């Protein structure tokens, strides 16, 4: 049984989903989804928005049924918090702060950045790391930046089966990477965007928080519904790192004298070298 998309034209209208961009900023390839031009703005055909949204829901259910993950992408100001909350609630991955180049096409580099994040967390938790207060403060600052950029993908160990994107023009690098790898892209597309590289177009106002939230919530609910019907647990993408037993923080006696200086210098050198080469901090 498919997830019933109960969203109405009235709700879309009230959210402002029908407002496109100025006629001078349109992309002709969006013409099939435009209802009319009014007062210098293009008005999106919400009947087509609703029809496309129902197709999108079916696609999401198929993706979950194939046991593939979904990556929500929305780094613009209006979308980032909505994307983060929705992804966490339905247990899927997200990129809401910054799209790191190679997040899909060079996953090995991103995984190395995640390892650096995990290692920094271990050092911050250990009371005998051998680091000075200044080094610990710098480490904490870099940890915040790393966590900010990697929070939603730190557990993404394989390529997603679907990207859900807010404004493919703004997220063109993410869309291009997905295209290179043959990963289908679903996107909220405004009248100024090129829908050509998008597999599942949802025409709507992608600058209005009300419009974004309304549509993203439908997509999120479709994910949750599919997982419940299939008995798939919802695991938060922002859970702490899963560490093997040998990586657990261990309290060891501190070395003394020259041995302490040597250990601190060696560990510190390796640590800062790893951090300086970390892609997510650039």
From Swiss-Prot:
A GO molecular function term, named singly, is:
structural constituent of ribosome
Q: SUPFAM superfamilies, alphabetically?
A: Ribosomal protein S2
Pfam families noted in UniProt = Ribosomal_S2
Choose any GO biological process term that the UniProt entry carries and state it: translation
Q: What GO cellular component is one of the record's annotations?
A: cytosolic small ribosomal subunit
Keywords from the UniProt entry: Ribonucleoprotein, Ribosomal protein
Family annotation (CDD domains): RPS2 (cd01425)
Q: Cross-referenced Gene3D superfamilies, in alphabetical order? A: Glucose-6-phosphate isomerase like protein, domain 1, Helix hairpin bin
Q: Where is this region: Disordered?
A: 245-265
Q: Belongs to which family?
A: Belongs to the universal ribosomal protein uS2 family.
Q: What is this protein called?
A: Small ribosomal subunit protein uS2
Organism, by scientific name, is Chlamydia trachomatis serovar A (strain ATCC VR-571B / DSM 19440 / HAR-13)
């Amino acid at each position: 049984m498919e997830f019933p998309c109960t969203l109405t034209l009235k709700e879309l209208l009230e959210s402002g989903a029908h407002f496109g961009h100025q006629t001078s900023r349109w992309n002709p390839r969006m013409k099939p989804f435009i209802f009319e031009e009014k007062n210098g703005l293009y008005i999106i055909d919400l009947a087509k928005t609703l029809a496309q949204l129902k197709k999108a829901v079916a696609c999401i259910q198929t993706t979950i049924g194939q046991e593939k993950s979904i990556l929500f992408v929305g780094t613009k100001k209006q979308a980032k918090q909505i994307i983060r909350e929705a992804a966490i609630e339905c247990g899927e991955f997200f990129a809401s702060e910054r799209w790191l180049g190679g997040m899909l096409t060079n996953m090995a580099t991103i995984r190395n950045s995640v390892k650096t994040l995990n290692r920094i967390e271990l050092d911050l938790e250990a009371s005998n790391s051998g680091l000075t207060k200044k080094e610990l403060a710098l480490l904490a600052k870099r940890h915040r930046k790393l966590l900010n950029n990697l929070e939603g993908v730190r557990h993404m160990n394989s390529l997603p089966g679907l990207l859900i994107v807010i404004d493919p023009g703004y997220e063109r690098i993410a869309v291009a990477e997905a295209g290179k790898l043959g990963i289908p892209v679903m996107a909220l597309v405004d009248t100024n965007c090129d829908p050509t590289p998008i597999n599942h177009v949802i025409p709507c106002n992608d600058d209005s928080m009300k419009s974004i939230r309304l549509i993203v919530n439908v997509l999120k609910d479709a994910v949750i519904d599919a997982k419940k019907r299939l008995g798939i647990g919802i695991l938060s993408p922002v859970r702490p790192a899963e560490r093997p037993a040998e990586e657990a923080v261990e309290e060891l006696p501190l070395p003394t004298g020259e041995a302490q200086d040597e250990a601190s210098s060696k560990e510190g050198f390796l640590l800062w070298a790893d951090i300086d080469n970390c892609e997510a901090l650039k």
